[in-house]
Amino acid sequence: MNSTLFKILAVMFLIVGESLAIYSEMIIARNYNLSPNSLFQLFLKMFILITVAGGFLLLGYVTSYSAFKNIWIVSVASIMSILIVEPVLAWTMFKQIPTIGSIIGLALGIIGFIVAMIF
């Protein structure tokens, strides 16, 4: 497989895993506030989803390490996916606008990811 394509696929596994994990966390937080009586049913659904997310994360870590040969790049890619996905999901699900500190933190995270990938 093409090295660049393999790296992209490996990072995509990380992004999907982080996205599913964050989504399940936010769904249970949002819906628990709406209906505390159905917490157990919601917990079971989100437990299954976060288990799938864990599978994607494991696959993402093993393929990313194989592709990049550097665990630090894998860690940065994982953190970067969280920095991008979590604010998007938070805004989509909760309709809350980020604070200036959140925006600055996201910008610095993006800069850090770019620096780690280049050097």
Where are these regions (language model features)?
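Polytopic alpha-helical membrane proteins, predominantly small-molecule transporters/carriers
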Residues: 1-119
